[in-house]
């Protein structure tokens, strides 16, 4: 025991306990201190003896012995000589392991610039010397001199001299000045830098300068100089005089058979450096001519460059096989580099993989493990059991027994496996449910058996998928596997909070079949005592499964006290439903079972069960449902036959009619009445409509059949057609697929997404002819190619998301903020996209919710809204709630539980230590592969939607108009004169039911506050033109409307009416450039009429292309159109859909033609125009007017004299999230990104909780730009973490200083990942070289806060069960004096601890970990 304790003690000491990792530049002395000797020769090993050469790259004297405890010449062998240095060969006798960590060094004959600091942009050496990179390179590669000491001459320091200039200068001044070339020159300049003085100068310059670019440049340089000052790095260390040599076992040389060697590329690169270095030393000793020495120096510089980062400068050095050699930089970067290959992902022992097959008889927490695999995986456990039982005397004997597979071994295996969970994993692991724990059941055969209900989580199917098995070894690991990862503990999806253990396919079909009802089935109208009797009747053939009968049902209902009370009723049901009720757990209502169960209904049922009865019952129910479903699916005998695809009789008639219509359109086109585009669109519309009609006829035909009921009358019932049942239940197939089988295939898309106008009129049952087949392959092949590309893109998006969010963990319970985001139901047009209850479920209320219309508190602040509260919200018809959100959370590092709300996968408030960032990233990334790359415009749907021209109300209620300005015309109708008007319909409870955008110039039949009935049309407008509405009555007076200059006259050939068309500025003659055509309204005397309630004259400027049909001097009434502006057809813009759109949003990319937003609130006017742009002026109520130049071709949404609010959209186009953040703030940008991302996912029918997107948005917003720094540690214009500014501001507030002012900045996820505080995390993500260079120069410290950093240094992550471990370490760090007191008693009088003390200490450590785990596990049960 003593030895063991000593051994443990020694082991635990070796693990240096560190809290921070610092990276910096290595000084030459530092490199020499690491080194165990200088490498002088380029030789590696002797080709005959295979012994390393002395002083060579593998020298045993420098790096350590080749064999354990044995010197090279063999004089000293074995352990007793440990630590002796052999006098003959100079090798220390020790473990050969030291060859992995002992470094050597090379003394360079001349200094060499480090390529990372030279060439990694922006060049650090260039920045600190304030010289362009080109000049530095010319000095380094010996093309020109640089002045290092100007002396009393007219040369400047840092000035470059060519060879001639240098010689001239030397003649003039002799040795008064000093100029050098090569790295010596650069090193001298760096050594002479006075950092403090430079910083002072830069600061002064910053104060004086006004130019933006200069400020930026100075700030950059100042930051670098300050970093050097603070980190203690010296600038001259960026030029190396000593080169470290990697330990030899990290760049091995392996003899192959046949006398050849396989070697690491690094050895080649080192050999080159040493050869050139030695040659240079010799040349310097011989005092060779300058030009030769220079060439050698340049070659040395190049070879060192290649060793550090091959291919960064010039051509990469290649090996014998023409492939570039792998340098030190290549070793760490990229997917195969050190970070991603060996530190973030490791291969593990105790694992195996095999094909999976279905295990329909398993319980949810079990999986079938082949005996062969189990034997191999649990080997050590079996050995120890065999030995401890005394069955085998030694481990060796045990091994023999296992290899012979003796019968006793199988018994022991069964014992070992019992209750030892194993992990199953299916690649690709897109979310955390891709690895789950199961209890193994030993089976014959070689395939793993998987429970069918977990397939959805793994996204597995049994067409040859493989899965990997891992064995958790330690007790803690087994505990975690059982408590956190067991498949029974993962019933709900972390992405949406819905059950993920949901039956699919066969099971659904079986349940659907057994709960259907049939008219006049055998046994209809019978009465049964209980479900058991009903089942008996079915089994004995006295009644059919679908017969409508009456059965006595006993339900268990909760009473006031919350106890279950039995209630028995006689209910109408069917035999199948009664049988299904037998597996229902107590406390479920019968009405959930007493219906035809499709996939949705079953999912609801499991969800209901989980919320009512908890985990255990739900899991048992799911299992029972599965067994029943399989059994009855087999009974149903549903199959697919060709006769099940019934083609509707009306099909030919419908197609004939459509063909006739198309012919007519073609006729019109030939006679020039419609354009080619119109013809194409109309043809597609006709065929799309025909397809719909055929499909409708087909579905009516398939879905119902007429039967004779008991009274002898015909009655319609849902049909028992197999194909229809499969689609209707949601087991397999969809209406769209049946349409292709039995209706018509319809319109096909080309690979670019455009629609081929000839449809395929045949269906698959009739068969396609060659042409039709060819057309359909066209778009289908694109689909297959897309899928392959999609997967890679989706994986990359997930990786970026994980990287940006990885360090977000729940770190405290409540940050105490009162901020939050305001939630309302999502309404688009006439339908509720998402009800309020779905949006606030699982959130915490930020402010008391009042009962509508009263001051009474309905839901107090800080309440977690669960299903019960949702019902209250519905009942009281609340339609706006302020909930807490991750984006507004005040916690410095991490998020608080209250702001996050419910843990979706567990159903209670989230625990501390939960890694919400990673969960969010996985939830968004996992469905990524399902998102189509491009949204195919389904026949004509895209063009139809854009051309709305009226609003028809779907619900009765009251109309409410927002942002509305209008005039009333002579018919008493209202004509809108405002831009972004919204029309909402509100029901009697004050809930918003519908929400529409109404365009300018629309005619409304109802005013604000009017009542409407269902189906009423409340607004009309012309979708093709935009009118200019007169706001007063009067006579028209033309202004600047000159024929031939600003306008042209057109006469319609058919009607003979003439109209005036305004020309674009670009098309006018020079004389007309400055004229601004307008219509003024005057009274009979010719005076301007003022617009009511303003002092602005009524005159309307006409944009280009506007058409005026009225004449000068015509009378016009208020609300009439003065002119019309034709609208380019909207909706032809191809919207990027699917994955690329999501990526664009998270990368915060600026759209090509972003919308222009109003920078301030005020009145719009237009100033003087220039050639291609017009000047937009916004004049606020007080303060400066704001001017902006806008290109002519942009369509503006505002008229002169209109009032705009800050952040309003002025011109069409997509909004930039950066603008939204700047002008409308954090809430608006969160809203924007969340809604836009959800839009994409909703189209695909994927449900993701808003929380996850908010988490990513929080990470995108974690940087701020300092706008006013006062006397703080920040610089103006510097980008800093928001949390750092907040911490600084809290301190300043206590000291009574003014707070640092800052603006939040939105970064795309890639940028945000690279801008993280942790350089380890950033380096392992992308652009490794750049990140490490920057970090080293700045002497950055990594606090190891995130998950990635801790994985890389090999620690427990500060999340989940590792959260407590990190908290304890933090506590100990913050209270060193108490820690000392705690450790004092262990040291006894004699200064040594007893074994018992040490044992106790070790026990404490183990307990600590288990306690924290126990605490975490209990947190889930307290609810």
Curated annotation (Swiss-Prot):
Q: Which CDD domains match?
A: RNAP_beta'_C, RNAP_beta'_N
**Biological process according to GO:** DNA-templated transcription
| Binding positions (Mg(2+)) | 461, 463, 465
Q: Which cofactor does it need?
A: Mg(2+); Zn(2+)
Q: Is this entry keyworded Nucleotidyltransferase?
A: yes
Q: Which UniProt keywords are present, listed alphabetically? A: DNA-directed RNA polymerase, Magnesium, Metal-binding, Nucleotidyltransferase, Transcription, Transferase, Zinc
Q: What EC number is given for this enzyme?
A: 2.7.7.6
The record's free-text note on cofactor binding: Binds 1 Mg(2+) ion per subunit.
The protein's annotated catalytic reaction(s) are: RNA(n) + a ribonucleoside 5'-triphosphate = RNA(n+1) + diphosphate
User: Which residues are listed for Zn(2+) 1 binding in this entry?
Assistant: 71, 73, 86, 89
Q: Which GO terms describe its molecular function?
A: DNA binding; DNA-directed RNA polymerase activity; magnesium ion binding; zinc ion binding
List of residues binding Zn(2+) 2: 815, 889, 896, 899
Keyword Cytoplasm (UniProt): no
The organism's place on the tree of life at top rank? Bacteria
Q: Which GO terms describe its cellular component?
A: DNA-directed RNA polymerase complex
Family, per the entry? Belongs to the RNA polymerase beta' chain family.
Oligomer and partners: The RNAP catalytic core consists of 2 alpha, 1 beta, 1 beta' and 1 omega subunit. When a sigma factor is associated with the core the holoenzyme is formed, which can initiate transcription.
Physiological role:
DNA-dependent RNA polymerase catalyzes the transcription of DNA into RNA using the four ribonucleoside triphosphates as substrates.
What protein is this chain from?
DNA-directed RNA polymerase subunit beta'
Taxonomic lineage is:
Bacteria, Pseudomonadati, Pseudomonadota, Gammaproteobacteria, Pasteurellales
């Amino acid at each position: 025991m003593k030895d063991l304790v000593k051994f443990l003690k020694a082991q635990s000491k070796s693990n240096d306990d560190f809290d921070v990792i610092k990276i910096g530049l290595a000084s030459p002395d530092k490199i020499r201190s690491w080194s165990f000797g200088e490498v002088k020769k380029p030789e590696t090993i002797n080709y005959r003896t295979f012994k390393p050469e002395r002083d060579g790259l593998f020298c045993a004297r420098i790096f350590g012995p080749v064999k354990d405890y044995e010197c090279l010449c063999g004089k000293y062998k074995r352990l007793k000589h440990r630590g002796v240095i052999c006098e003959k060969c100079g090798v220390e006798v020790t473990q050969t392991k030291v060859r992995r960590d002992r470094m050597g060094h090379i003394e360079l004959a001349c200094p060499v610039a480090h390529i990372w600091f030279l060439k990694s942009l922006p060049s650090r050496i260039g920045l600190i010397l304030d010289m362009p990179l080109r000049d530095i390179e010319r000095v380094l590669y010996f093309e020109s001199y640089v002045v290092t000491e100007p002396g009393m001459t007219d040369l400047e320091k840092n000035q470059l001299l060519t060879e001639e200039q240098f010689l001239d200068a030397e003649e003039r001044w002799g040795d008064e000045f000093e100029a050098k070339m090569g790295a010596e020159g650069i090193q001298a300049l760096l050594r002479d830098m006075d950092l403090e003085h430079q910083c002072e100068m830069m600061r002064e310059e910053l104060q004086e300068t006004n130019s933006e670019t200069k400020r930026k440049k100075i700030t950059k340089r100042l930051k670098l100089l300050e970093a050097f000052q603070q980190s203690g790095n010296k600038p001259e260390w960026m030029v190396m005089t000593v080169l470290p040599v990697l330990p030899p076992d990290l760049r091995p040389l392996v003899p192959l058979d046949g006398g050849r060697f396989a070697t690491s590329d690094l050895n080649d690169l080192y050999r080159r450096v040493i050869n050139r270095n030695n040659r240079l030393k010799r040349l310097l000793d011989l005092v060779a001519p300058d030009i030769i020495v220079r060439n050698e120096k340049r070659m040395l510089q190049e070879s060192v460059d290649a060793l550090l980062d091959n291919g960064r400068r010039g051509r990469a050095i290649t090996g014998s096989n023409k492939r570039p050699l792998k340098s030190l930089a290549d070793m760490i970067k990229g997917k195969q580099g050190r970070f991603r290959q060996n530190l973030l992902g490791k291969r593990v022992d105790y694992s195996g993989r095999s094909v999976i097959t279905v295990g329909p008889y398993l319980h949810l927490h079990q999986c079938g493990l082949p005996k062969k695999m189990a034997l191999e995986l649990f080997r050590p456990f079996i050995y120890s059991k065999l030995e401890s039982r005394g069955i085998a005397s030694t481990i060796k004997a045990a091994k023999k027994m296992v290899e012979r597979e003796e019968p006793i071994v199988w018994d022991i295996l069964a014992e070992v496996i019992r209750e030892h969970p194993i992990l199953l994993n299916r690649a690709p692991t897109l979310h955390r449910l891709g690895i789950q724990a199961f209890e193994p059941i030993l089976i014959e055969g070689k395939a793993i058996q998987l429970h069918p209900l977990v397939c959805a989580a793994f996204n597995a199917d049994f067409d040859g998928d493989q899965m990997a098995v891992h064995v958790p070894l330690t007790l803690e690991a087994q505990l975690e596997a059982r408590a956190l990862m067991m498949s029974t503990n993962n019933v709900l999806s972390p992405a949406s909070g819905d059950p993920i253990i949901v039956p699919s396919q066969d099971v659904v079909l079986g349940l659907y079949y057994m709960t259907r009802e049939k008219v006049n089935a055998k046994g209809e109208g019978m009465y049964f005592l209980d479900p058991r009797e009903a089942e008996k009747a079915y089994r004995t053939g006295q009644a059919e499964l679908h017969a409508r009968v009456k059965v006595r049902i006993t339900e268990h209902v909760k009473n006031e006290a919350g106890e279950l009370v039995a209630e028995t009723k006689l209910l109408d049901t069917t035999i199948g439903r009664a049988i299904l009720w037998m597996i229902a757990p107590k406390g479920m209502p019968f009405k959930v079972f007493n219906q035809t169960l499709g996939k949705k209904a079953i999912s609801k049922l499991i969800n209901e069960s989980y919320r009512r009865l908890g985990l255990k019952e739900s899991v048992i129910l799911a299992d029972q449902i599965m067994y029943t479903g399989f059994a009855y699916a087999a009974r149903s005998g549903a199959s697919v036959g060709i006769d099940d695809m019934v083609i509707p009789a009306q099909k030919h008639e419908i197609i004939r009619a459509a063909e006739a219509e198309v012919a007519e359109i073609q006729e019109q086109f030939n006679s020039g009445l419609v354009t080619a585009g119109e013809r194409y669109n109309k043809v597609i519309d006709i065929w799309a409509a025909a397809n719909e009609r055929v499909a409708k006829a087909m579905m009516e035909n398939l879905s119902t059949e007429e039967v004779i009921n008991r009274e002898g009358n015909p009655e319609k019932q849902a049909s028992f057609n197999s194909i229809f049942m499969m689609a209707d239940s949601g087991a397999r197939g969809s209406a769209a697929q049946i349409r292709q089988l039995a209706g018509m295939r319809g319109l096909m898309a080309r690979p670019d997404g455009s629609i081929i106008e000839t449809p395929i009129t045949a269906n698959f049952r009739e068969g396609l002819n060659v042409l039709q087949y060819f057309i359909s392959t066209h778009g289908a092949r694109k689909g297959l190619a897309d899928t392959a590309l999609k997967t890679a893109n989706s994986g990359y998006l997930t990786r970026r998301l994980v990287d940006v969010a990885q360090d977000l963990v729940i770190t405290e319970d409540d940050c105490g903020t009162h901020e939050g985001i305001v939630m309302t139901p999502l309404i688009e047009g006439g339908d509720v996209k998402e009800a309020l209850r779905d949006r606030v479920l699982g959130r915490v209320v930020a402010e008391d919710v009042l009962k509508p219309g009263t001051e009474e508190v309905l839901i107090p602040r800080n309440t977690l809204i669960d299903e019960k509260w949702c019902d209250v919200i519905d009942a009281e018809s609340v339609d706006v709630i302020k909930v807490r959100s991750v984006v507004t959370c005040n916690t410095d590092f991490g998020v608080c539980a209250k702001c996050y709300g419910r843990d979706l996968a567990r159903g209670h408030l989230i625990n501390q230590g939960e890694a919400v960032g990673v969960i969010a990233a996985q939830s968004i990334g996992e469905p990524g592969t399902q998102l189509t790359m491009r949204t195919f415009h389904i026949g004509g749907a895209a063009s139809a939607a854009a051309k709305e021209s009226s609003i028809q109300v779907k619900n009765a209620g009251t109309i409410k108009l927002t942002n509305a300005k209008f005039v009333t015309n002579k018919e008493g109708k209202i004509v809108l004169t405002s831009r972004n008007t919204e029309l909402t319909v509100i029901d009697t409870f004050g809930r918003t039911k519908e929400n529409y955008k109404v365009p300018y110039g629309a005619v409304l039949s109802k005013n604000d506050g009017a009542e409407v009935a269902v189906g009423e049309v409340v607004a009309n407008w012309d979708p093709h033109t935009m009118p200019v509405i007169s706001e007063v009555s009067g006579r028209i007076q033309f202004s600047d409307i000159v024929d031939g200059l600003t306008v042209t006259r057109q006469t319609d050939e058919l009607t003979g009416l003439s109209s005036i068309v305004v020309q674009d500025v670009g098309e006018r003659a020079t004389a007309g450039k400055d004229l601004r055509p307008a219509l003024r309204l005057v009274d009979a005397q010719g005076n301007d009429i003022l617009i009511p309630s303003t002092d602005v004259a009524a005159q309307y400027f006409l944009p280009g292309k506007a058409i005026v049909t009225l004449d000068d001097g015509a009378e016009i009434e208020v609300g009439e159109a003065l002119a019309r502006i034709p609208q380019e057809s909207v909706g032809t813009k191809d919207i990027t859909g699917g994955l690329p759109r999501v990526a664009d949003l998270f990368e915060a990319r600026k759209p090509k033609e972003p919308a222009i937003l109003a920078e301030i609130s005020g009145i719009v006017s237009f100033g003087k125009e220039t050639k291609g742009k017009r000047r937009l002026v916004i004049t606020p109520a007080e303060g400066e007017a704001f001017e902006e130049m806008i290109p002519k071709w942009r369509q503006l949404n505002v008229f002169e004299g209109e009032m705009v609010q800050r952040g309003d959209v002025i011109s069409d186009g997509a909004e930039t999230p950066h603008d939204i953040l700047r002008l409308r703030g954090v809430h608006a940008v969160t809203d924007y990104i969340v809604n836009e991302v959800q839009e994409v996912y909703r189209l695909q029918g994927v449900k993701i909780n808003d929380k996850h997107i908010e988490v990513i948005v929080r990470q995108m917003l974690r940087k701020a730009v300092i706008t006013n720094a006062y006397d703080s540690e920040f610089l103006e214009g510097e980008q800093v973490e928001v949390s750092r500014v907040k911490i600084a501001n809290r301190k300043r507030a206590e000291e009574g200083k003014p707070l640092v002012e800052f603006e939040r900045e939105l970064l795309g996820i890639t940028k945000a990942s690279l801008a993280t505080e942790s350089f380890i995390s950033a380096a392992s993500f992308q652009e490794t070289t750049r990140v490490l260079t920057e970090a080293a120069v700045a002497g950055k410290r990594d606090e190891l806060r995130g998950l990635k950093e801790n994985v890389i240094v090999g620690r427990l992550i500060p999340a989940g069960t590792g959260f407590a471990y990190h908290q304890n370490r933090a506590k100990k760090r913050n209270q060193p004096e108490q820690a000392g007191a705690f450790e004092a008693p262990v040291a006894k009088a004699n200064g040594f601890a007893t074994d018992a003390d040490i044992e106790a200490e070790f026990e404490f450590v183990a307990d600590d970990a288990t306690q924290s785990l126990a605490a975490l596990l209990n947190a889930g049960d307290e609810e």
